Amino acid sequence: MDFLSHAMLSRSESTQILCELSQIDESTMDPQYTEDDVLARLFVFSSSSPQTVLNVKKYEDVSVGRSNTCNYQLLQFTASYKHFRVYSVLIDDDMDPLVYCEDQSSNGTFLNHRLIGKGNSVLLSDGDILDVRHCASFLFQQKYTTDNDFHHEYAGERFNITQRLLGIGGFSRIYMAMDNNTGGQYACKIIDKKKISTKRFFEDHEMTILRKLDHPNIIKVNMEYNSETQFFIFEEMVTGGDLFSYLTKLGTVPEVTTLFIMFQILQGLKYLHEQNIIHRDLKLENILIASSSDTIFRIILTDFGVARCMQKGKRLSTFVGTPEYTAPEIQRLKGRSQVEKENSSGYGKEVDLWSLGVIMFLLLSGNSPSFADGVKEKQVDFRDPVWKSVSRQAKDLISNLLKTNPPDRFTVKQCLSHPWFARHSSRLTKLYETRILKPLKHSRL
């Protein structure tokens, strides 16, 4: 059978599904689920079995394939042992859960007639149809809040900006956008110029910085667009959530997983600092996960809204960042007049390393750092029982990152030379090349 005939058959099957849907008892389609932990549902249509409903629950994957361990087993040999999985990401309590489908198959999983591709994940929207051709089709149903403030001035032809809200920031909202040429999904950050002090704030800083960045551990910008009152940044769709949702799910992150997470963050920071760029707002929410299917995943630094390019010999003196992650030298600027700030010693790249120490402490313990009085300065408090299972090297690295005196704080280079990384250096490098760089290069061809 040629490709066209195959595609026509699939469309015919989908049409048949839609006909069957019109005959379904509406009570079974009620979006008000009886179970609190049910986030969405998949209605299964197959000629070889009766209609089935699969519930997508909080922190539970729904797997489909030939394996008898799958939530829904496909009997046809054209299906893969593990064909696809549906999983959810909960960003925070104020946001609707985001539900994704990861294609794990050799023969392909199709979303609304478009091939997803093995190893790729897509965001699912209410009414989407997943197809495992010649096996079964799955209608996705999810009730989510419609953004009443949705409005945009994008007049370009390449993208269609949908009302699927992915995130909310101080000056912006992030929506799902579709590439009209390829059907690919993107995250569109819409910045409201009326909410910022000057129109040049983001245009001169965030986009100036993002335009010249090209690194596996830094968010990739595909396009930008400028209108009278809005600024648009079209970024790669990242489908694994962020480190905050990841930590919330696990409670604490195993040390071996934290090791590779920290290694990647440092690769991104090394790249930024070599170009004299300071992020200034590193936190769990601004570090994304490319995929949640494994303990080995790509880490992506995002949100460069307050990032700055440092001029040689100059220090920064603006009070910015998130208090929980902010370095002491930035905290000391709070409440000071502009003259006092300018006369202060300011701060530099060291602030990103303090934030990194807070992140590492949070990942390993699930709590924010606390300090005990020391002889010369406050010491990181590791008395909580959770630290008994954490290595001495990991705690030593945290202590060197959370030095209140900036010159005493570890640099990126010192971090990567620390025994916690150094004793695993060759393995970390190989893992980074084979599991991060190689797949990414292949996906961007």
From Swiss-Prot:
Belongs to the protein kinase superfamily. CAMK Ser/Thr protein kinase family. CHEK2 subfamily. Probable protein kinase required for meiotic recombination. Keywords: ATP-binding, Kinase, Meiosis, Nucleotide-binding, Serine/threonine-protein kinase, Transferase. It comes from the Eukaryota. Transmembrane segments: none annotated. InterPro entries: FHA_dom, Kinase-like_dom_sf, Prot_kinase_dom, Protein_kinase_ATP_BS, Ser/Thr_kinase_AS, SMAD_FHA_dom_sf. This is Meiosis-specific serine/threonine-protein kinase mek1. CDD domains: FHA_MEK1-like, STKc_CAMK. The active site is at 281 (proton acceptor). Residues 160-421 form the Protein kinase domain. It is an enzyme of class 2 (transferase). ATP binds at residues 166-174, 189. GO terms for cellular component: cytoplasm; cytosol; linear element; nucleus. Pfam families: FHA, Pkinase. GO terms for molecular function: ATP binding; protein serine kinase activity; protein serine/threonine kinase activity. Residues 62-116 form the FHA domain. It catalyses: L-seryl-[protein] + ATP = O-phospho-L-seryl-[protein] + ADP + H(+); L-threonyl-[protein] + ATP = O-phospho-L-threonyl-[protein] + ADP + H(+). One of its GO terms (biological process) is reciprocal meiotic recombination. Its EC number is 2.7.11.1.
